């Protein structure tokens, strides 16, 4: 794979401000843009340009988050008809609903729409409609956001990822976006990627920093660990940090636990009421059922929540599963991040070189003094990796902005 380094000028915070970037990347063809850091505005660069653009994302949360930031910009979110609960539901979609969604997209294109937001599994419908409407495919650019997820999701969505990969070949212009540099060694083994050029952004050292991750090797249960965290925040004793000699205290905790079963167990054991907690997970029938059972057991209603928008009220505790590991934007000015990993439990296994960087990158506000901080709870005794090797891998892979 050929790699080209593009130096980002000093003072550039978002790449949409980097006016000379378009002179350094292709105007057509397939290529990879390794942005190196999260939160640098890569998708905004493409959504804000004059080109016809299809943003393909692996997660609905990411797409809705982006769509809600551009309500006045005439974007089309495929399969969204104004009913948010319906959009996030992971139940089966009837043939009549599919026809309606396709007709809505068809009308959007007929009326001159140029910005389409889709999940990976909708690329086939999008391509079909563009062809039906005699659109010049050369004029459309597909932006595959967080494309590393194509590989991670293969073990449970192999058909979806393969069909996405096949349909992408029907588009002459495709940009693969990622902040995950380690992918190179794997991409070189794949015919589809090995002949592409990877354009890698090189940021000035003063513009990036390594997150401050407090790594705690522990054999305690998730519930026991959460008990200490919940108690601290309820008593106004959240994490603190000093900035220019002034002490700041966190009043909100974001807890990344990729198991709704464990989240429910924590809420039940620690008597966390709905007013205190936001649960962000995939809207599957199984997860909905677990929250209904929790509601029945405690006598209060718990349901799947939303990512708060800019200016929205944040609850003291937010539990997140992997559905928001990538691409989602949180706008808290004081939230601190906690990450739980356990190699003995498949759902709690994380890739330290990818997932942690993505998770920490979810906090977007520079005014949050805890933006680049996190505590990682892990248990290397349950894996073949030593604690020293774990820490070295983590420190090598992390970079934030």
Each model region followed by its residue ranges:
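Conserved Walker A/P-loop ATP-binding site and its immediately adjacent core
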Residues: 38, 42-85, 183-185, 260-261
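Conserved strand-helix element at the start of the C-terminal RecA-like helicase core
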Residues: 52-66, 119, 232-271
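Inter-Walker segment of RecA-like/P-loop motor cores
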Residues: 73-128, 296-308
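SF2 helicase catalytic motif II
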Residues: 120-123, 132-166
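Post-DEXD/H (motif II) to motif III coupling segment of the RecA-like Helicase ATP-binding lobe
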Residues: 149-205
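Interdomain hinge/linker at the junction between the two RecA-like core domains of SF2 helicases
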Residues: 181-236
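A short beta-strand element within the Helicase C-terminal
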Residues: 330-343
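Conserved SF2 helicase motif VI
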Residues: 344-372
């Amino acid at each position: 794979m050929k790699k080209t380094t593009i130096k980002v000028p000093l003072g550039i915070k978002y790449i949409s401000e980097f006016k000379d970037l378009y002179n350094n990347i292709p105007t057509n063809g397939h290529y990879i843009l390794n942005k190196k850091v999260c939160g640098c505005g890569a998708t905004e660069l493409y959504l804000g340009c004059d080109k016809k653009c299809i943003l393909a994302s692996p997660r609905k949360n990411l797409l809705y988050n982006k769509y809600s930031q551009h309500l006045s910009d005439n974007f089309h979110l495929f399969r969204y008809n104004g009913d948010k609960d319906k959009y996030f539901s992971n139940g089966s979609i009837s043939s009549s609903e599919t026809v309606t969604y396709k007709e809505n997209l068809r009308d959007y294109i007929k009326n001159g729409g140029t910005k389409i937001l889709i999940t990976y599994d909708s690329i086939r419908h999008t391509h079909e409609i563009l062809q039906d409407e005699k659109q010049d495919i050369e004029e459309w650019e597909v932006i595959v956001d967080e494309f590393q997820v194509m590989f991670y999701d293969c073990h449970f969505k192999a058909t979806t990822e393969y069909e996405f990969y096949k349909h992408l070949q029907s588009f002459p212009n495709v940009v693969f976006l990622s902040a995950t540099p380690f992918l190179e060694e794997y991409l070189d083994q794949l015919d589809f990627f090995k002949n592409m050029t990877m354009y890698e952004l090189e940021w000035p050292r003063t513009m990036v920093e390594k997150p401050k991750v407090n790594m705690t090797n522990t054999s305690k249960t998730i519930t026991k660990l959460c008990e200490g965290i919940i108690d601290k925040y309820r008593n106004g004793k959240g994490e603190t940090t000093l900035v220019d000699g002034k002490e700041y205290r966190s009043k909100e905790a974001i807890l990344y636990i990729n198991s709704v079963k464990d989240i429910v167990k924590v809420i039940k054991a620690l008597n966390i009421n709905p007013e205190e907690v936001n649960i962000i997970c995939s809207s599957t029938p199984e997860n909905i059922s677990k929250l209904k059972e929790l509601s029945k057991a405690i006598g209060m209603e718990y349901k799947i929540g939303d990512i708060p928008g800019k200016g929205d009220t944040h609850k003291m505790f937010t539990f997140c599963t992997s559905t928001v590991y990538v691409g989602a934007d949180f706008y808290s000015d004081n939230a601190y991040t906690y990450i739980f990993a356990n190699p003995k439990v498949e759902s709690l296994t994380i890739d330290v070189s990818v997932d942690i960087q993505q998770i920490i990158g979810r906090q977007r506000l520079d005014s949050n003094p805890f933006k680049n901080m996190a505590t990682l709870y892990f248990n290397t005794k349950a894996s073949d990796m030593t604690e020293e090797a774990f820490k070295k891998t983590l420190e090598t892979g992390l970079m934030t902005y």
